[in-house]
């Protein structure tokens, strides 16, 4: 037995952005918390260059695949029960915004964190590869 078990329920082929397909995510019934992850490095890049299954992401956002991802697009995916919160079903939810060290404009993180706070969505910004404070 263990105190904490992390299970990847929905891969993105190393792309920083995606929306779940019909059959995703596969969250184990014993899970009591879901952590959704989005990489900040998607912001400002074209959907076709940064998203896993770009046609699905573009359709979800109501955009073309050659349009850039905005912080508001990321927020739409985070807050949606068809996006990052799909399958949460009453479990605790945390949005982890990764690669904060890649942000050219730190106001983007501040805007997203403010939206999360206003909406009661627990969110953390950070970088799993580098110290953000260095």
PLM regions with names:
Residues 80-93, 119:
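A structural motif corresponding to the C-terminal end of an alpha-helix
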Residues 3, 32, 91-92, 121:
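Short coil/turn segments at beta-strand junctions that form active-site/ligand-binding loops
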Residues 106-134:
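Canonical P-loop GTPase G-domain recognition
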């Amino acid at each position: 037995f263990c105190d904490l078990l992390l299970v990847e329920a929905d891969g993105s082929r190393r792309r920083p952005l995606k929306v779940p397909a019909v059959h995703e995510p596969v969250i184990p019934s014993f899970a009591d918390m879901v952590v959704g992850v989005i990489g900040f490095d998607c912001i400002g890049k074209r959907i076709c260059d940064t998203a896993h299954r770009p046609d699905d992401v573009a359709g979800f956002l109501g955009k073309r695949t050659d349009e850039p991802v905005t912080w508001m697009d990321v927020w739409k995916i985070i807050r949606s029960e068809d996006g990052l919160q799909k399958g949460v079903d009453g479990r605790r939810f945390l949005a982890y915004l990764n690669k904060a060290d890649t942000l050219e404009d730190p106001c983007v993180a501040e805007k997203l964190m403010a939206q999360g706070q206003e909406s009661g969505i627990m969110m953390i910004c950070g970088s799993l590869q580098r110290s953000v404070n260095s």
